[in-house]
């Protein structure tokens, strides 16, 4: 069977080695005679798995000791709510930087839940010669006392990425759902990081939260117990039954990433993959991209065919060639190739070859 390369934005492809290992031990995990899906989350065997997963993630991301690592329910949207309820209190203020669809969605959720609290926002994307560009404000010039500033460094729908780390006088809350572990960051600059698992961590249903200890002292609002960071810390992410199979697969992904050389190594490959695809787009008048070079996403490469009437044929022929899930988000249309950590370089080589051949045939 020919290779199939899955460019889905999420749930995304998992490393082949992880999938094969999960397949091999699906019915008998760790010599238990049963699946990892069937054992108690409080058993010593599963606790050992969770401890190793956290240890591996801490090593990969160089997470300081004054940060808690939580494995939670709810995905990214669940954390939109949890951030507000855990940190804003009844009279707090927060600032949301809007760079695309997901940061906008976080803002809408915050406004819905804030009550008497104040939610401010800044649109940080402008048009430069018809292309989307991020313009980061000087936050130190803003006279306000915010509990936190929220932003999303990578917008999967819009194909926009912010590579410069934010400089803020207030704690930074970041949605890293689509960039976590794709490149190195300084965790100590953040008050809280959250990430839905279904892009660079594992399957959907799990979210990772990395929260600095002092953030847990901020006033909170009444909320669901399973989204209470303080309870999650107190109960080692097991206030209720966690998504155990997703946790297991996340642990395997962390181990796989360590075995491949860690984040510094995968970051070089990710950069190479993105550069290769953007060079194809820029080098062919058949395709176009709407983002300035400095803010083009490495994880989610969006592009359009100049002749949009060929979109359906492009997707049909790509599917036949084993290149799946290339259709752009319904809001923006066009095409999108998601190049998360699990996407091998060979997948991008195959996509570029197909794009060049398709353009030559239909130009």
Curated annotation (Swiss-Prot):
Keywords in UniProt for this one? Amino-acid biosynthesis, Aminotransferase, Cytoplasm, Pyridoxal phosphate, Pyridoxine biosynthesis, Serine biosynthesis, Transferase
**Keyword Lipoprotein found:** no
Q: Which positions does UniProt annotate for pyridoxal 5'-phosphate binding?
A: 76-77, 102, 156, 175, 198, 240-241
Q: Name one GO biological process term.
A: L-serine biosynthetic process
The reaction(s) catalysed by this protein are: O-phospho-L-serine + 2-oxoglutarate = 3-phosphooxypyruvate + L-glutamate; 4-(phosphooxy)-L-threonine + 2-oxoglutarate = (R)-3-hydroxy-2-oxo-4-phosphooxybutanoate + L-glutamate
The record's top EC class is: transferase
Q: Which cofactor does it need?
A: pyridoxal 5'-phosphate
- InterPro entries per the UniProt record, alphabetical: Aminotrans_V_dom, Aminotrans_V_PyrdxlP_BS, Pser_aminoTfrase, PyrdxlP-dep_Trfase, PyrdxlP-dep_Trfase_major, PyrdxlP-dep_Trfase_small
Q: What does the UniProt function comment say about this protein?
A: Catalyzes the reversible conversion of 3-phosphohydroxypyruvate to phosphoserine and of 3-hydroxy-2-oxo-4-phosphonooxybutanoate to phosphohydroxythreonine.
- Tell me the protein's name: Phosphoserine aminotransferase
The organism is: Shewanella baltica (strain OS223)
Task: Output the lineage of the source organism.
Answer: Bacteria, Pseudomonadati, Pseudomonadota, Gammaproteobacteria, Alteromonadales
């Amino acid at each position: 069977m020919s290779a199939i390369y899955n460019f889905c934005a999420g749930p995304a492809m998992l490393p082949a080695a992880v999938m094969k290992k999960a397949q091999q031990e699906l019915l008998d995990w760790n010599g238990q005679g049963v699946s990892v899906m069937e054992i108690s989350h409080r058993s010593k065997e599963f606790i050992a798995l969770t401890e190793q997963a956290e240890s591996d993630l801490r090593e990969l991301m160089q997470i300081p000791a004054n940060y808690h690592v939580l494995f939670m329910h709810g995905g990214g949207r669940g954390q939109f709510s949890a951030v507000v309820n855990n940190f804003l209190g009844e009279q707090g203020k927060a600032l949301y930087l809007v760079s695309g669809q997901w940061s906008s969605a976080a803002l809408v959720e915050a406004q819905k839940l804030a009550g008497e609290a104040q939610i401010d926002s800044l649109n940080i994307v402008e048009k430069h010669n018809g292309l989307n560009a991020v313009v980061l404000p000087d936050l130190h010039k803003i006279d306000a006392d915010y509990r936190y500033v929220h932003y999303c460094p990578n917008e999967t729908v819009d194909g926009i990425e912010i590579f410069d780390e934010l400089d803020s006088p207030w704690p930074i809350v970041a949605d890293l759902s689509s960039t976590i572990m794709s490149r190195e960051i300084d965790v100590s600059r953040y008050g809280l990081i959250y990430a839905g698992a279904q892009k660079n961590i594992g399957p959907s249903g799990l979210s990772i939260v990395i929260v600095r200890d002092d953030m847990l002292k901020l006033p909170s609002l009444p909320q669901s117990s399973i989204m209470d960071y303080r309870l999650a810390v107190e109960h080692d992410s097991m206030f209720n039954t966690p998504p155990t199979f997703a946790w297991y697969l996340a642990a395997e992904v962390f181990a796989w990433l360590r075995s491949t050389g860690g984040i510094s190594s995968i970051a070089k490959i990710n950069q190479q993959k993105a550069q290769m695809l953007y060079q194809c787009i820029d080098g062919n008048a058949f395709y176009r991209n709407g983002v300035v070079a400095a803010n083009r996403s490495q994880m989610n490469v969006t592009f359009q065919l100049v002749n949009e009437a060929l979109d359906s044929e492009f997707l049909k022929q790509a599917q036949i060639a084993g290149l799946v899930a290339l259709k752009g988000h319904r809001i923006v249309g066009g095409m999108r190739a998601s190049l998360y950590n699990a996407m091998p370089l060979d997948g991008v080589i195959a996509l570029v070859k197909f794009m060049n051949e398709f353009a030559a045939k239909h130009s």
